[in-house]
Amino acid sequence: RMLLTVPKPLLGMTGKVYLNSFRRKAKKHMERQKNGLHPFDWEIQYQDINKNSFEINITKCGFITFAKKFGAEGMLPGICNVDYMISYYMGNGFKRTTTLGYGDSCCDCHYELVGKCPIRPTGDLK
């Protein structure tokens, strides 16, 4: 609901700022993870595509580690699907064909500063 209270033009601008910040942090995280990770951190591979898009493959997820430790694995599908909802409302493009939270070997995330995505996963994802 909180996202819905923000005016739509502001959401689009916020989405671009958020993803550009996320992009910079992902590049830094690639270097930082070489020195080891916190037990609840993410292990990623980042790739710049162009000014509008980038990809992150997540091979270790902090949410999954945390959920397993505290017996809360049932929350994972909902947590995993939040990426779609946020991108949908902020006017960003997002797609993912594999998801760790559904038992796949990685989350293959494709982000676009300007793009479209469904509010929830489609196709074979649960």
Can you annotate each of these PLM segments?
Residues F22, M90, H110-V114:
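Short amphipathic alpha-helical patches
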Residues W42-Y102:
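Short, hydrophobic/π-rich interface segment
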